[in-house]
Amino acid sequence: MYNKNNNNNNIIDDNDYDDDDDDYNYYNNNNYDYNENLISKDTKKQKDLEKEPLSKSIAFISIGTLTLLYVIVELGAALYVGSLTLLSDGFHNLSDVVSLVIAWWAQKAAKRDSDNFMSYGWARAEILGGLTNGCFLLSMSLYVALEAIPRFIRPEPMESGLIFMIVAGSGLAINILGTIVFACTGMSHAHSHGGGGHSHGGGGGHSHGAEKEKKKEKHGHSHDGADKEKKKEKHGHGHSHSTATTAVGINSEEHNHDDHDHHDHSEESHGHSHGGEKKKEKKHGHSHSHGGGAAEGININDEHDHDHEGHHDHSEENHGHSHGGSEKKKEKHGHGHSHDGGVEKKKEKHGHSHDGVEKKKKKKKSSGTCLGMDLNMFGVFLHFLGDAISSLFVLITGAVIHFTHGKWTEYIDPAVSLIIVIMIAATSAPLVKRCSMILLQKVPDDIDLDSIRYKIAKVEGVVSQHDLHVWQLVDGMTIASVHVGIEQGREFQSIASKLRKIFHKEGIHSTSIQPEFLPINSFTGGATSDPNFCIQNCVDDCEEEWCCKKSADRIRMRNFNSKNSNIVDINDI
């Protein structure tokens, strides 16, 4: 036993996963390669995206041209009346034109294929565009703020409020149009680079299984030797059962039931009782997905994960489940069930995932922006939203100057300029920060590295791990790499499959797992005792280039301080 926590409760087995991921089950049960299907999904998505850039190009060109014409008019008016507010708004709109050009280029560049010079392609062009847009806004805000402060010391009288109103009104209309266009364009074409996820709500689950031999019933049913002569009652539940009848063959059944009361099953079958057993019952919407391996040779140990409101009834090898069995009236519930019933001679365990009554599963943060746009489009959207608000303030400023008189009106222009600057900076700073964190390859906020390390350590055959890195290529596309120490003699492919499941459940679909087959330490009787032991470094020649050089430094120091008989020399391994 080389793993310190090597016992039944701490070792991850293939069947320790809830298998509530429909995509993974579908590909796994049908002998498909999951990663290849993810690639095919991304390829299809890429082809769909290639058909869409026309609308974005039209939006960029039309709004950009209109904005450029307006900037020329606004800057001319600002110089004519000597207004800092109009000047700042004009420069703001000019930065919009520049940002539109950058964003348009980023959209085009992001669709280029990878080559020998850009192995990832130009995917990060959108991030670069969003960062540039944010920096333009922040620099413009700083410039206007520096210009506005002297105006409070030496205020200048303002006239021609009517010109303010005409110019600001035109700008407000253009910016509102741009905001709507890019909000709609960005949301309708938004995409996530995660590998095709699904969202399942209560009562609306689905099941991927073999399409052959599907049967539809409108009454009771039995599984794998259940008594067919039992009384069949109407049900009000939608069930999708995918039962593996042999090690390879798959038999799928679909049942539609009305006013479901109970299921009765014989030995080694699955009995379920949904609904109250004592008094009145309200409607329940259930969606079930059952996958049961019925071949005698199958040995599956799925852990229990029950989140039921009510109780369970179990007897010998026949498992009866009562979901939501309260003593009085029942509330409406929507349940999504995923059952993977592997039949063993004396033990059966079920994995349940319930959406509805008290869903306790942790929800992950969405990786996109609040409107579902990529960061590049979100930057353009922020530009026009900020412009629309600033144009509104300019319009108010013009109205105040035109309809009121007094010494205090001289402070309106610089005051409004500072308000606009604060609003623009408040919306731009988070965009710059987010783009910067992606370029700095920060770990995404919804990823817990300690949790991943813990799960990796539980995998049977893994004795050490180090250099775990998780980062984002673009917003929504997370990548990971890790070095794992494996006992000599272990099959790497099976261990890698378990590790990929761990990353997959964390929303990481692009992983690089580097195995390190560790030697047996004759002095300890097990694998090397250093959990950070790394044998992939060439200690002598490329000390500054190691990806895990800290580990090798510890090995060097241990070798230096050890007796000759205990030296661990990487080059001798």
From Swiss-Prot:
One of its GO terms (molecular function) is metal ion binding. Induction: Down-regulated by Pseudomonas aeruginosa, PAO1 strain and PA14 strain infection. The keyword Cell cycle does not apply. It is a multi-pass membrane protein. One of its GO terms (biological process) is defense response to bacterium. Residues 193-207 have a biased composition (Gly residues). PANTHER family: FI23527P1, ZINC TRANSPORTER 63C, ISOFORM F. Belongs to the cation diffusion facilitator (CDF) transporter (TC 2.A.4) family. SLC30A subfamily. This is Probable zinc transporter protein DDB_G0282067. It comes from Dictyostelium discoideum (Social amoeba). The lineage of its organism: Eukaryota, Amoebozoa, Evosea, Eumycetozoa, Dictyostelia.
